[in-house]
Amino acid sequence: MGNYSRRRFLQGSLAIVAGNVLPCAAMAADNPPLWIPPLTSVGRGSPILLNARNVKKAFDNNKVDAWGFNGSYLGPTIKMKQNDFLRLTYRNNLSEAIAINIQGLQANGEVSGSINRNLAPNSSWSPIIQIKQSASTCWYHSDTIGRSAYQSYRGLIGMWIIEDEESKKNLLPNKYGENDIPLILQDISLNYDGQQVFNLEKNSFLGKQLFVNGQRNPFINVARGFIRLRLLNASVSRPYYLHLDNQQPFFKIASGLGFLPQPLEQKVLLLAPGERAEILVNTNQNKPLRLLAGDSANIIDKVRGWLGMSDHLQNNLVVELRPQGLASAFAQQKPTLPDAKLGLPLSPQKERHIHLSTQDAMINQRRFDPRRIDIFAQLNSVERWVLTADQATGFQLQGAKFLIEQQNGERNKKEMLAWTDTVWVEGETRILVQFDNPSSNSYPFIFGASNLLLADKGCMGLLVVQ
């Protein structure tokens, strides 16, 4: 075989990729309709089964093996009301042990699940969970020690919505799948057979393609007016910078665990891994709106990605919103929100410094040890945690909630505050943590990197609240 230079190879590859990529833009009409995870609304005391098992899923054109709950890739969306309770049965029909965490659930450590409740194959666990918290958008996913990233990536993911009476009284869109739309973002790499590919060797994983509710480049027909999007970054490591293609602003109305004091108009939304947010998008127009995740890869980036040399996404469309019907007068008015229940001012009783080492997968120079409690906090207290990291990464906390007090030396204004459990740490980040739920040495909470692969490598710790 003659001498074949790298430059000639790249030039040939560019021609191939250009031939494959350019027609796709002209085939936007072939984009799939957005799949909406089935809704399970829970009444008072109702039982729910989450059955983890093997499923078939077509990421590309071929159906391949994946994981999921109740027979589908990704689990059902569970909706509950404040002050309701349910009997939740986790069933493991997979060939390896799993543990499931409901991230954002404000409950005691004994019923929270997570690493404290490891389910062997063909076993089950049935906690009774009471919902005390205000309106929230939570999510459930694998939290198995050393395997949470891989198992979540395979499909052990679902959204969990909590409503309260005050939020129902407001005129916010609340028709699930119509004007209140769940969007679960994942970056996934596929092989030539359309099967998921995952690399466990590094401390982070960046997939090549963006999937939303298990689909690439989906669209949804929506009524004109305000549309509520519940956004969940379910990617292992990748953050997302979300914006509309026409640079139109939208209103952020909530973080994962509560509403903002008032709608916050912005053009870009950053979502850390594991973070949730709610936004309102005005679709009172004649043209489709495209929600995008950063910039799309150009042809060179696509080639580099094909060669394993680029971390750019090959596609960046989250969803295309296609307005239908008559214009809505309501969309001309700025929406109002329920009480954010911030309880300000918060007076911290203690300050802690927490450093995430993204290179060595440690917190404060210590790697995770399931036999060691790293932090003891007092029940019903408030603490200030000062977060830093070697490189920008996500941080999350279980069983408690916090307000983001300061980021990169800038203090957040009151109108930017909302309760959450996840934050992107770039530079110094100060959070005010409120401990409303008890845990114990036998059933501790966890905290640490929201990059699940980094957490699996040891960048997390155990928290006891008493």
UniProtKB/Swiss-Prot annotation:
Residues 1-28 form the signal peptide. The gene is ftsP. It is found in: Periplasm. GO terms for biological process: FtsZ-dependent cytokinesis. It comes from Gallibacterium anatis (strain UMN179). Keywords: Cell cycle, Cell division, Periplasm, Signal. Gene3D superfamilies: Cupredoxins - blue copper proteins. This is Cell division protein FtsP. Belongs to the FtsP family. GO terms for cellular component: cell division site; outer membrane-bounded periplasmic space. PANTHER family: BILIRUBIN OXIDASE, CUPREDOXIN SUPERFAMILY PROTEIN. Predicted to be exported by the Tat system. The position of the signal peptide cleavage has not been experimentally proven. InterPro entries: Cu-oxidase-like_N, Cu-oxidase_C, Cu-oxidase_fam, Cupredoxin, FtsP, TAT_signal.
